């Protein structure tokens, strides 16, 4: 493939932006080489500035669940912008969005719109601290909840990709208020609550880890956390920025039958535009200003164009059978990848929940951060580039989940698996 235009743009970008990108994982530092620059996207495909086409399993890191540039979403945006881009005042679309979320998500009786997943998680933590009068939070190794200071302790996503345990610039005192557990560790969670349970404001968790690749919870684990939080008076927060409306219509909480106190959203509810939200029970949410004393605000929150895009996307995922078909397609992909690896003699396992999947270069089932980081990253990197050269774009890190959309039909999956058979053979040469 020719990448001359992408190379020129990346060289220019490195003089203008830190690392040449606006989010670290995009720089390809984990996998090596240089990123391609996207010109446009459609359905299951990305097209770069050099004219190359890629089957896309990143999907803008999750929100493109109906494929890129879906006509219904695009048309909703086109209609909305005729009325203006931003009002800084209430609009009908944000009321409709709130009604939709509260109708579909078990934990949400009220919801507040924000502008990103990071903003949603920061706001949820502030609410939890204000509502409980406590300061400590509990998170999990490899889980990423945005770049707020409290979360950059043994975080996933770009932090894990770069091998940084805790970011410089995070005050030690703030880090000391964040306790970290191993995901899927029942005994560790119990022991921690026995020790500091009375000080914990909230437990925040990705119910399916999507930022240390894709790691589902063991049976009963989320319920165990729910029980501990209830017993000790702490709030349980599900970060459903990735899982919300993707693994099931009601998110991971509906899929696993465990209801948190607060839920954070992003990605899909903006249809690809910058949006976030957090929601929970009425008694908690009415403590947020102006209804209550816990302050949170945002000029662009509830932006009418973003609301229009998100509502169109949520309408699509409510179609009968949408999530069942998405899960079937993802299973077909994962089974095919494992078969192709096995035939080539490459140790690979996969995890899948709905339309999310993880590809691990190991012969062991991966259930936590430590196991994810023990996988063969060198072989993954070679596989990544072999796939990219054949026009298949996986996340440029061994520690990021993959995403399938409804635009990934059987022909797209078969083309992916044909490329994988070649790529697995390449890494064994």
UniProtKB/Swiss-Prot annotation:
Keywords: Cytoplasm, Isomerase, Porphyrin biosynthesis, Pyridoxal phosphate. GO terms for cellular component: cytoplasm. Transmembrane segments: none annotated. Its cofactor is pyridoxal 5'-phosphate. One of its GO terms (molecular function) is transaminase activity. PROSITE patterns: AA_TRANSFER_CLASS_3. It is found in: Cytoplasm. It is an enzyme of class 5 (isomerase). Belongs to the class-III pyridoxal-phosphate-dependent aminotransferase family. HemL subfamily. This is Glutamate-1-semialdehyde 2,1-aminomutase. The gene is hemL.
């Amino acid at each position: 493939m020719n990448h001359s235009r992408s190379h020129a743009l990346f060289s220019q970008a490195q003089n203008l932006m830190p690392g040449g990108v606006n989010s670290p994982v995009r720089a390809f530092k984990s996998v090596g080489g240089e990123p391609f620059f996207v010109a446009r996207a459609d359905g299951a495909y990305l097209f770069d500035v050099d004219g190359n086409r890629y089957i896309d399993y990143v999907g803008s890191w999750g929100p493109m669940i109906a494929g890129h540039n879906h006509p219904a979403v695009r048309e909703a945006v086109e209609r909305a912008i005729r009325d203006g881009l931003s009002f800084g005042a209430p609009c009908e679309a944000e009321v409709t969005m709130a009604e939709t979320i509260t109708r579909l998500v078990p934990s949400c009786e009220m919801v507040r719109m924000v502008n990103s997943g990071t903003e949603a998680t920061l706001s949820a933590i502030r609410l939890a601290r204000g509502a409980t009068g406590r300061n400590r939070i509990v998170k999990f190794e490899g889980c990423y909840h945005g770049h707020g200071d409290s979360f950059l302790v043994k975080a996933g996503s770009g932090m894990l990709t770069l091998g940084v345990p805790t970011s410089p610039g995070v005050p030690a005192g703030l880090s000391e208020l964040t306790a970290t557990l191993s995901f899927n560790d029942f005994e560790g969670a119990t022991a921690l609550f026995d020790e500091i349970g009375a000080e914990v404001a909230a437990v925040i968790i990705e119910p399916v880890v999507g930022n240390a690749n894709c790691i589902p919870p063991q049976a009963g684990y989320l319920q165990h956390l729910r029980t501990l939080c209830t017993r000790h008076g702490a709030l349980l927060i599900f970060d459903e920025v990735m899982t919300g409306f993707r693994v099931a219509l009601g998110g991971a909480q509906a899929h696993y039958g465990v209801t948190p106190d607060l839920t954070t959203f992003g990605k899909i509810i903006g249809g690809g535009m910058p949006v976030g939200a957090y929601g929970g029970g009425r008694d908690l949410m009415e403590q947020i200003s102006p209804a209550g004393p816990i302050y949170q605000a945002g000029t662009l929150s509830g932006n009418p164009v973003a609301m229009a895009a998100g509502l169109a996307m949520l309408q699509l995922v409510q179609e009968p059978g949408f999530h069942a078909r998405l899960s079937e397609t993802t299973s077909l992909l994962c089974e095919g990848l494992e078969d192709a690896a096995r035939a080539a003699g490459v140790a690979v396992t996969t995890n899948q929940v709905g339309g999310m999947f993880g590809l691990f270069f190991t012969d062991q089932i991966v259930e936590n951060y430590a196991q994810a980081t023990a996988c063969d990253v060198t072989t993954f990197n070679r596989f990544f580039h072999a796939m990219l050269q054949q026009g298949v774009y996986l996340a440029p890190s061994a520690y990021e989940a993959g995403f399938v959309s409804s635009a990934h039909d059987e022909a797209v999956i078969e083309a992916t698996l044909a490329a994988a058979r070649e790529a697995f053979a390449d890494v064994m040469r």
